[in-house]
């Protein structure tokens, strides 16, 4: 099943589903292996920088809560919103650094396709960057706006960390 049920933040009685990011991750990461190899560098930090630079060139439409394009579709359409970019980068980065846990982070008030979303790697990766702490676990943000994550934290909007594997 490519969707999972969720609780609608405004009314528990309303329907709510969101993409099953973990299942989609496993479904598409093998397809992207040849592309991932293009970002292989001397160290993880350089590979991540190359991926981030490449991803920034993909146009970002306004956030789509009622639509989700899996990684291959996002590449074909040459556009991806925050959760689509997060899953695309995760699918590529997992081929280069499978030893580190990756998570999709999103606000708990999200409905449907989460918005906004960030890809994060565990702090034990040694990567430098903006850090978010969720449930006493430090995450390094790899995609999305760190300022927006900080604003949500300051506004007391809880963030959810959904491990991809």
What are these regions (language model features)?
Residues 1-165:
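A structural boundary/capping signal
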């Amino acid at each position: 099943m490519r969707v999972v049920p969720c609780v609608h933040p405004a009314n528990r009685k309303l329907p709510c589903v969101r993409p099953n990011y973990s299942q989609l991750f496993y479904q598409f990461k093998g397809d992207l292996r040849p592309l991932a190899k293009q970002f292989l560098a001397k160290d993880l930090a350089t590979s991540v920088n190359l991926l981030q630079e490449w991803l920034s060139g993909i146009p970002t439409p306004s956030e789509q809560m009622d639509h989700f394009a899996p990684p291959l579709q996002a590449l074909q359409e040459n556009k991806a919103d925050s959760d689509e970019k997060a899953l695309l980068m995760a699918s590529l980065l997992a081929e280069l650094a499978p030893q580190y846990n990756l998570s999709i982070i999103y606000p708990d008030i999200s409905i449907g396709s989460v918005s906004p979303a960030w890809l994060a790697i565990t702090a034990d990766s040694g990567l430098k960057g903006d850090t978010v702490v969720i449930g006493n676990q430090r995450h390094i943000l790899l995609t999305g706006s760190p300022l927006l994550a900080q604003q949500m934290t300051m506004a007391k909007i809880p963030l959810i960390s959904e491990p991809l594997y």
